[in-house]
């Protein structure tokens, strides 16, 4: 992470979480570097949309903040697509999800983020509802489950990769 050019400038960390699929969840969070929880609500955005729309929304967000010198750290967590024996891991939707994991990862890298692709099984046990709530992310209805899964990846990346404070610490 770099230091802002102005000595009194606020240093921000931008974290993004993505749960790719036919319905994609995105979570955008900005942290005052090393700041405390809960994060003010205006610094947390949860989005759920079709994968193509979500890709365009993310690109617009990244372009808007590209070059913002206050953002000294950019991390992202993208949920990996794990192939298994269930019906959801084969067929057209599975192929699209695999493609979108790569498309989102490439887009994030293009805008200076350091995305890590992780399995849900590695993130979910740590990113509990209690931890999300303490971080300022309220419980979501089932219809928003993809954005909530994205929030898990976002918070995990912020704490594990950008060394932000654990909300439960």
Predicted regions and their residues:
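Phosphate- and other anionic-substrate recognition elements at nucleic-acid/protein interfaces
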Residues: 2-169
């Amino acid at each position: 992470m770099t230091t802002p050019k102005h000595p009194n400038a606020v240093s921000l960390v931008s974290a993004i979480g993505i749960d790719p699929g036919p319905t994609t969840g995105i979570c955008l969070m900005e942290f005052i570097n090393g700041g405390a929880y809960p994060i003010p609500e205006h610094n947390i955005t949860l989005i759920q949309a079709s994968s193509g729309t979500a890709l365009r929304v993310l690109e617009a967000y990244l372009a808007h903040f590209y070059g913002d010198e206050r953002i000294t750290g950019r991390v992202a967590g993208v949920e990996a697509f794990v192939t298994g024996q269930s019906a959801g891991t084969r067929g057209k939707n599975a192929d699209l999800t695999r493609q979108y994991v790569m498309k989102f990862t490439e887009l994030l890298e293009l805008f200076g983020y350091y995305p890590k692709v992780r399995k849900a099984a590695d993130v979910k046990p740590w990113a509990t509802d209690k931890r999300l709530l303490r971080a300022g992310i309220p419980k979501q209805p089932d219809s928003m489950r993809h954005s909530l899964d994205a929030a898990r990846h976002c918070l995990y990346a912020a704490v594990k990769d950008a060394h932000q404070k654990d909300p439960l610490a």
